[in-house]
Amino acid sequence: MRTLWQHCHVATMAEGRYSAIEDAAIVTSAGLIEWIGPRAELAPVEADRTVDLGGAWVTPGLIDCHTHAVFGGNRSGEFEQRLQGVSYAEIAAQGGGIASTVRATRAASEDELFASARQRVQALMRDGVTTIEIKSGYGLDLANERKMLRVARRLADELPLAVRATCLAAHALPPEYAGRADDYIAHICDEMLPALAAEGLVDAVDAFCEHLAFSPAQVERLFIKARALGLPVKLHAEQLSSLHGSSLAARYQALSADHLEFMTEEDAIAMAKAGTVAVLLPGAFYFLRETQLPPMDALRRHGVKIALASDLNPGTSPGLSLRLMLNMGCTCFRMTPEEALAGVTVHAATALGLGDSHGSLEVGKVADFVAWQIERPADLAYWLGGDLPKRVVRKGHEISN
C-alpha cells in the first residue's frame, strides 16, 4: 500500500544532522520510504491513503542500541542499600549484584522472562522506539543464554519492533567457574557460541572488558571466535578503568564500544579509523553517581560517531525511557540536542550494523518514523518524562496514535 504523509516538518537525521525539511511530505510503499522532500516538489502521486500529520515534526523511529531488557528478579532492594551506605562489594558478598540476577534469570521460565521483558520493551516503545538491541548475559551457561536469546527473538515476532540479539555470555563469571575465567572463555568459544550461532539466535557478540570481568586477552580470544563464525563484535569498555578495550574493539572492526568514561585520545583515534561507534550510557553514569565523563572533545575532534542508549538493566540503569537518555546525554555529557537525537537514530543504527536500512529518513530506507507534536526537534531532549503526543509508524504502518 502506498501512503502519502503530509503537513509535517522532517528532521531526516541524514549524516548525523537535523537536515530539516519544512512543509514536507513522505511517500511510503512496501515498508520503505519511496519519496521524501518539500511538499511543493512532490509530483502527483496515486496514494492508497493520505495522512495529515497536523504540522508535526517527524523524526526517524528511535533506536535503543544497548539494553539488557531480558532478566529475572528485581534489585531495588540493593538500590536502597547503596543509598544507606552499603558498598557494592558488601552487597556482592551477601550474594547480591549480578549474581542475584543470574540466579533469578536461571530460575525463571522462558515464558516468565518473556512476560516481564515485554512490559519493559513496551515502555520503551511508548517513547517512540522502533528498533532495539537486547543482550543476553544473565544466564552464563548454554541453556540459560539460549533461553534469553529465544526471548529476544519472540519479542521481535510478537511486537511491531525490530530486535537485534547480542550474545553477552562474557558478562561475568558464573559461580561454577569461580576463579577460572580462562576456562569459561574457552567454554563460550568452544561450545556456547557455536551452538547459539548455529540456531540463528545471535546477531552480534559482546563482552565486558574490565578488571572485575574479563581481560583484553580473554576478550580477544572471544573476538577471534566470533570472527570465525562470521559474527560482528561489540564491547563494554572503559567504564571503570582504562584497559584500552576500545582500541581492541577497533582492531576487530567492532560495531561499537560502549560506556567509555575512561577511554583515552588514542582509543578515540583507533575507533575513528575503524568506524567503531562510541555508545554512551548516561543512565548508568547517573544511577551510579559517577564523576568521570567520557572524553567528548576527543570523540568530536576525531570524528567518532556517538550513539546514546538506555543500558536498561536491573543493577545500574533501570531506565525505561530513551527520551530521558536524550536529556541526560545533554545535561550529564554536554551533548547538543542535535548530537543526542543523532545518537538514538542514525548513529545508533550504525552501532547495530543497520546503517544502510535504518536510522535516517532517506529514500530506500525502512519507513520507521515518529510524528511528534512539538515545536522543534530539541524538545525531545528538553522535556523530562511525560508522553509527548505522537504517531509511531513501523514499516509504513501506524502502530501508535
UniProtKB/Swiss-Prot annotation:
Keyword Ribosomal protein annotated: no
InterPro entries named among the record's database cross-references: Amidohydro-rel (IPR006680), HutI (IPR005920), Metal-dep_hydrolase_composite (IPR011059), Metal_Hydrolase (IPR032466)
One matching Pfam family: Amidohydro_1
Binding-site residues, N-formimidoyl-L-glutamate: Y138, N313, G315
Cofactor detail note: Binds 1 zinc or iron ion per subunit.
Subcellular location(s) of the protein: Cytoplasm
Residue sites binding 4-imidazolone-5-propanoate per the record: R75, Y138, H171, Q239, T316
UniProt keyword Calcium, yes or no: no
Names of the cofactor(s): Zn(2+); Fe(3+)
Binding site for Fe(3+): H66, H68, H236, D311
Major location category of this protein: cytoplasm
GO CC terms, sorted: cytoplasm
Keywords: Cytoplasm, Histidine metabolism, Hydrolase, Iron, Metal-binding, Zinc
Family designation: Belongs to the metallo-dependent hydrolases superfamily. HutI family.
Name of the protein described by the UniProt record: Imidazolonepropionase
Natural source organism: Pseudomonas putida (strain GB-1)
